[in-house]
Amino acid sequence: MDWLDDVKWDAQGLVPVIAQEQGTGDVLMLAWMNREALRQTAALGRAVYFSRSRGKLWFKGEDSGHAQTVHEIRLDCDRDVLLLRVTQQGHQPGIACHTGRHSCFFSRLGDGAWQAVDAVLKDPRAIYG
């Protein structure tokens, strides 16, 4: 039996993936993987996701230079969520979000409204052109 068969894939053949920074424990982002993305991530030691909007593999950092080196891949108790422990590359501190922030989780609910609480580290126009 292939180790990929132990994962509970959804009806579209995908599984959600949380990327967590190895050194700080910061939650960087949530993305999706299909079997090939997970296979390549394990083989290459760098994060490869599946882009639902583009319908293809997405090598994290291929456009931005902000790749993720994968140190550990974990599967949750229900076998339907993955956790990647990563080092975020390309900037210090690492930029995981396409908005130029460290984490995609930069909005906090307060007083009935979402507020951006984390600074933009690099203008996205400078990242993506």
Swiss-Prot record:
Residues the entry annotates as binding Mg(2+): 76, 78, 80
GO biological process: L-histidine biosynthetic process
EC class of the enzyme, as a word: hydrolase
Binding site for Zn(2+): 77, 97, 104
GO molecular function: magnesium ion binding; phosphoribosyl-AMP cyclohydrolase activity; zinc ion binding
E.C. number(s) listed in UniProt: 3.5.4.19
GO CC terms, sorted: cytoplasm
Locations listed in the record: Cytoplasm
InterPro entries (alphabetical): PRA-CH, PRib_AMP_CycHydrolase_dom, PRib_AMP_CycHydrolase_sf
Entry similarity comment: Belongs to the PRA-CH family.
Name of the featured protein: Phosphoribosyl-AMP cyclohydrolase
Species: Verminephrobacter eiseniae (strain EF01-2)
Name of the gene encoding the protein in the UniProt record: hisI
